[in-house]
């Protein structure tokens, strides 16, 4: 197996306690490729958005991953704030693939619904979740992000 060492300038920080490592094998990329997780729970085919292909694409997977993680962060923050969440909190995630002068990039919107929660309290929960969620941390300062309370 070939590995690429990161330069000293871009070394990864070591986690205090490793909780989980996701493993996936991908071939072919978005143009007819496929991916499968090591445990087999996710097994997908890729296709380019806007083509007749029936596969998913990296942007859809990113939207699903981030919204699922962010919803867990919302639940954690609400619990710490001792706020009871509704039974049906939801996130509609939108991830755009863009192409500009600097090449390809992403931008994202997480449209969060917390029915029945006071608007100021809900906004505090979202702010805390955005500071807690690993996806939010990974994208902070790297892509345009909007977290909207709807």
Model-derived features: where do they sit?
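Extended beta-strand/beta-hairpin segments
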Residues: 2-64, 71-150
């Amino acid at each position: 197996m070939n590995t690429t060492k990161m330069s000293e300038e871009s070394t990864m920080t070591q986690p205090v306690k490793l909780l989980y490592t996701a493993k996936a094998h991908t071939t072919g990329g978005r143009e007819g490729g496929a991916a499968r997780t090591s445990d087999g729970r996710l097994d997908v085919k890729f296709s380019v958005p806007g083509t007749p292909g029936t596969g998913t694409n990296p942007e859809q997977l990113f939207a699903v991953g981030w919204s699922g993680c962010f919803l867990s962060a919302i639940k954690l923050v609400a619990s710490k704030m001792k706020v009871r969440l509704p039974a049906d909190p939801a996130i509609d995630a939108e991830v755009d693939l863009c192409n500009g002068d600097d090449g390809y990039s992403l931008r994202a919107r997480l449209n969060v619904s917390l029915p029945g929660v006071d608007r100021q309290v809900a906004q505090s929960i979202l702010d805390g979740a955005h500071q807690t969620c690993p996806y939010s941390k990974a994208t902070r300062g790297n892509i345009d992000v909007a977290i909207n309370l709807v």
